Each structure stands twice: as C-alpha cells, then as structure tokens.
C-alpha cells in the first residue's frame, strides 16, 4: 500500500500525529567512479577548488537538514545526528556513507539517501572540469532501525 496516496489516489502528506516517538536511524551509501588521476588529485589535496571531501561532507550534512524542502511530502525532521564519511575505494572510486538519527515519529531514510546523493553530486561538481566521465552509482539504503516497520539491513546478492 502506498501511504502517500489517499483513497482517491491523490498525493498527500502522511499524518504521523498519533505515531509514537521512537529512536530512528538510517544509513545510506553512494559511490562516485572517476579516473584514477582524479581520485589521486583529491586524495593528495591538490584540487584547485580545495578539500573535496570536506566540502562534500558539509554539503551532505546540509542536504540531510533540507530534505523536506527537496522531496515533496517528506516531513521536516529535527535531526539529532548526521554523519557523512567519504573515503577512497580502490584507485577510481569515492565511497560515501551517510547516517542520520533522531527520536521522532517518522523515519530518516530519505535524509540519509539525500545526504549521500548530494555529497556525490558535490564531488561531481567540484571535479567535472578535470573528469566529465564520472559516474554516480549505488545510491541505496544500507540499514534502517526503529519505527513500526522495524529493522532493515541490505542483504548483498551472492
């Protein structure tokens, strides 16, 4: 059942007034594939625009806080924690992990996904002058804790 549709099929914001306030946490990831030379430039701190990881981290945190402004029908949330981590993976990839937390009436999956996505977009923006062939991939929810639907953890396919 799609909870964002009413009985006539019209979109509406889900009413969470009567839902219990519980601890909720979500973790999402994204990857940015690039030329090895681009990744080396980022890791060595030689990018002319500055510290790519630091800017992408701040962009991801800001994006989590602005999710309800970007995603229609998403509730504005009082996040109590947002952590965005970036690391080199192999010789041609940046791995991004975003974790959001709160005590509230609705989940934080969209905030974690938005944080990871915007961090990836920021890397693309900062590096596009040297590598227009970058690919943003594997934007996905890794884990969700709390709420009525309980615990979800991505199971890797063998």
From Swiss-Prot:
Which biological pathway?
A: Cofactor biosynthesis; molybdopterin biosynthesis
Disulfide linkage: none
Active site: residue positions: 125
Catalytic activity, as annotated: (8S)-3',8-cyclo-7,8-dihydroguanosine 5'-triphosphate = cyclic pyranopterin phosphate + diphosphate
> In the record, what terms sit under GO molecular function?
cyclic pyranopterin monophosphate synthase activity
What Enzyme Commission number(s) apply to this enzyme? 4.6.1.17
Q: Which CDD domains match?
A: MoaC_PE
UniProt: substrate binding residues: 73-75, 110-111
Ranges that cross the membrane: none
Keywords attached to this Swiss-Prot or TrEMBL record, sorted alphabetically, are: Lyase, Molybdenum cofactor biosynthesis
Output the GO biological process annotations, alphabetical, semicolon-separated.
Answer: Mo-molybdopterin cofactor biosynthetic process
Pfam families this protein is in?
MoaC
Q: What does this protein do?
A: Catalyzes the conversion of (8S)-3',8-cyclo-7,8-dihydroguanosine 5'-triphosphate to cyclic pyranopterin monophosphate (cPMP).
**Which NCBIfam families does its entry note?**
moaC (TIGR00581), PRK09364.1 (NF006870)
Q: How does it assemble?
A: Homohexamer; trimer of dimers.
Which family does this protein fall into? Answer: Belongs to the MoaC family.
According to UniProt, the name of this protein is: Cyclic pyranopterin monophosphate synthase
Q: Lineage from the top down?
A: Bacteria, Pseudomonadati, Pseudomonadota, Gammaproteobacteria, Pseudomonadales
Encoding gene, per UniProt annotation = moaC
